[in-house]
Amino acid sequence: MTLLARLDRLPLSRPHYLLLLIGGLGYTFDGMDSAVVAFLLPSAQEEWGLSNGQLGFIGSATPFGFLFGATIAGLLGDRIGRKKVMMYALAFYAVFSVIAAFAPNYEVFLVARVLAGAGAGAESAIIAPFLSEFVPAKRRGWFIGALAGFFSFGFVMAALIGRFVVPTFDDGWRIAQVITALPILMLLWWRRSLPESPRFLLQQGRADEAEQVVADLERRVEKATGQPLPPVPETAVAPTTSAPKVNLISALRFLWSPAMAKRTAVIWLIWFVITFSYYGFFSWIPTLLVQRGITVTKSFEFSIIIYLAQIPGYFSAAWLSERMDRKNTIALYLAGSAVSAFWLSQMDSPVTITVAGAVLSFFLNGTYAGVYSYTPEVFPTWIRATGTGLSSAFGRVGSILAPTIIGLSAASLGFAGVFGLTTAVLVAGVVCVIVFGLATAGRSLEELTETTEEATR
């Protein structure tokens, strides 16, 4: 009987859903921060007289910070623990969000957005691998997909802020920026309610602490369900109780070793494809709607409709990922995204753009639900946070490039050309997943990574 077998046999119940809520709120505010910038751009442009190129740099600031934050969070998460990184990242993000709100000029605002993005990126990269280590294999796809679904609530909140706060007050865009710092209020709750990952504790040789976490979770699950716990199954794969020290060089060496190179290449490409397409679309959709002849306020209303389509996208993909595997779910939703992006490229009225944009929003965000479930599953525990962080960081290269590329090329390519480019990127992702993706549904984290452990010995 192993500690992790005891953990994996627990039925999902109130203690798991509390973890889902805690992590989900983190993703809600990450999503809000990522999306709100699109609604700040017109006001910032008017106040500081910014060019389209400068607006593109602001749009790229948060994902640029995400890149560094995700990389650092992964490395630290495998060294000092997932919980500490989550809390430090949240505080860092909130401080620089407030600084951005009171920025006196473009330069200070840009730097503050980059640093706030680093905090948000660190938090975002660590939540999914952290919580995936608490969830039984048979429900992990749904759980992490639903966790990622909280991003959609943040985007809807951003759209509502853009519609009702930004145009209502003289400094509405600054007030909106202050609102993004509110998650600082969650710190005390997180400190009291979040346990450290027992898988991380075992890897660090802290078996007594891991036992305490699992025993406490067992007690709470039994109390919540009012039933005896299921029997502990025999396990074929034992967890390792020691691991190499992780730094950036050793991590990259392992991730691109023969045992891991295929997995790493597929995951990194998927992250690049989805973030390039996602940020290229959502960073510019209000501005593109304005350029199609509607008012800024009306463009924000259309954006709310588009953002609302994210919610069923996330949760439908979370449901499907347990039934047709993460790999197939990602391929299906990427294909839907490609078709939707092409459809959007052919539209020329605000209403048809909004409808096509809502469908694209549904499929893009469904893809994200699959990706957030899939990524932590392919890396061993000792490097799970680092692997997830580096994958997310590489994806942020796409999100950095997309707003700037679209901002600079929209004049020459036009509306159709911009989304034609997005279609081509998405098609490449579909082919990659279908041909090279790994099936993961219903398998324990230790089983999925058993063969890769040989590369560390």
What does each of the following model-derived ranges do?
Residues 1-457:
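Transmembrane-helix signature of 12-pass secondary carriers
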